[in-house]
Amino acid sequence: MKQYDAVIIGFGKAGKTLAAELAAHDWSVAMVERSDKMYGGTCINIGCIPTKALIHSAGLAAAGHPLTFGQRRDYYRESVASKTALVDLLRDKNYHKLADNARIDVYTGEGSFASPETVAVKTTQGTQQIGGKYIVINTGAETVIPPIEGIAQSRRVYTSTSIMELEELPQHLVIVGGGYIGLEFASMYASFGSKVTVLEGFAELIPREDRDIAAAVREALEKKGIEFRIGARVESVSDTAAVSYTHLRAHETGAYL
């Protein structure tokens, strides 16, 4: 079993920075990352970089000449491809910043504790154990899926991560939740050309922000054609051949692809 001064579980911002710093001080380091799509962490792969790349492209679409929906759909597909190429480039650079360091070994697999000083890494080739004087957990978090009837069975329900892989521009997109992430995606897809409806279960949007800020944000988004339904409690989601319907207490909305 190979021994290291430090084993870091999670190739995110904190983990990669710590690994490089420890290696610079002559520590031997093992970096364990479950997914080869997450080298570098959230910001590079599923957060800041891809969202801002798409927002930039969406802004160009909104500022240009009027386009048919078919033209917008083609442009959106090109924008997703451009975003993916950028993310792939940055992910590769992040990987090699650590993997090319002689004092760092990168393991692509799921890490778990075999003992207080031992990490078992499950890879496609099997499971191996590595030891560390220090073990650092830098695993981040996963998306919370609300317990809404039919949501797990729907083929057209996306998270803020999975929707950025969607290559078909929705004609109508329903966003459940009026927090800052939901509103960021609402603005983006409205600029690309989708009809967007935001459903917020509470009495106001972005409740942690000052009310004048929230009012200004809502006004700006409504000018883009975004529809808001405040106090809308989603009871269930159901699919037809081409549409996912979001059922509210007294209303029904459609998300069209």
Indicate where each model-derived feature is located.
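Beta1/beta-strand and adjacent pyrophosphate-binding region of the FAD-binding site
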Residues: 2-12, 171-176
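Glycine-rich flavin
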Residues: 2-4, 21-27, 33-169, 197, ...
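N-terminal Rossmann-like FAD-binding beta1-loop-alpha1 element of flavoenzymes
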Residues: 6-27, 185-190
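Conserved phosphate-binding and hydrolysis motifs of nucleotide-dependent enzymes
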Residues: 10-15, 140, 177-182, 252
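Hydrophobic patch in the ABC ATPase nucleotide-binding domain
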Residues: 104, 178, 226
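Rossmann-like NAD(P)H-binding beta-loop-alpha module
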Residues: 168-201
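Flavin (primarily FAD) cofactor-binding/catalytic cores of flavoenzymes
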Residues: 232-234
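Conserved small/polar residues in nucleotide/adenosyl-binding loops
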Residues: 246-253
